[in-house]
Design a protein with these regions (language model features):
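ABC ATPase "signature
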Residues: 140-141
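Helix N-cap at the start of a conserved alpha-helix in ABC-type nucleotide-binding domains
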Residues: 91-93
Length: 171
């Protein structure tokens, strides 16, 4: 139980009460954390433009993740475990999210483990990269070594429709 005190979790699974407000939810679940700081939670709610009086059920997916992120930060964890948090954030908030993660880890005493499919998230603030496929490790290393050894390739599928000549020949 002591270890749990030092970990902030943000997952897509719902674990807050639908019919309670954000503040009521945070008070209820905050009592399980000895370092829970309601003042800090309210600062993050304001920063994330979330109304603490709003019912959890009325939030969008992105707002629910913002609230979970605020709650995770509000008990002063040493480690944040984040499962695809940016998937439902708009680009503007994603920038704020990255800024907060940099603030969180700035003093070198705290860490973030982030699961993501958004490779730009990794490139912006990761120190280490672990690449998994079906639960098996494909790659692990510090980000600079990975950059030196591998190249990220991005592209798009170019659809070309048949030319009129091809269309005529097939009739």
């Amino acid at each position: 139980m002591e270890l749990q005190q030092d970990i902030g979790f943000v997952f897509h699974e719902k674990w807050f009460d639908d019919w309670d407000s954000l503040i009521a939810n945070s008070r209820h679940y905050g009592k399980y954390y000895k370092n829970y700081d309601e003042t800090l939670l309210k600062e993050y709610l304001k920063r994330f433009r979330l109304d603490g009086k709003k019912k959890y059920k009325k939030l969008s997916k992105g707002e629910k993740l913002k609230f979970a992120f605020a709650f995770a930060l509000a008990h002063h964890p040493k480690l944040l475990l984040l499962d695809e948090p940016g998937a439902n954030f708009d680009q503007t908030f994603r920038e704020e999210f990255h800024h907060i993660l940099r603030e969180f880890t700035a003093d070198g005493t705290k860490s973030v483990i982030l699961s993501t499919h958004i490779t730009s998230d990794v490139d912006r603030f990761a120190d280490y990269l672990l690449l998994l496929k079906k639960g098996r490790q494909l790659l692990y290393g510090d980000i600079e070594s990975v950059r030196d050894a591998y190249r990220m390739v991005a592209g798009c599928f170019l659809y070309t429709s048949p030319s009129p000549r091809d269309y005529a020949a097939s009739r």
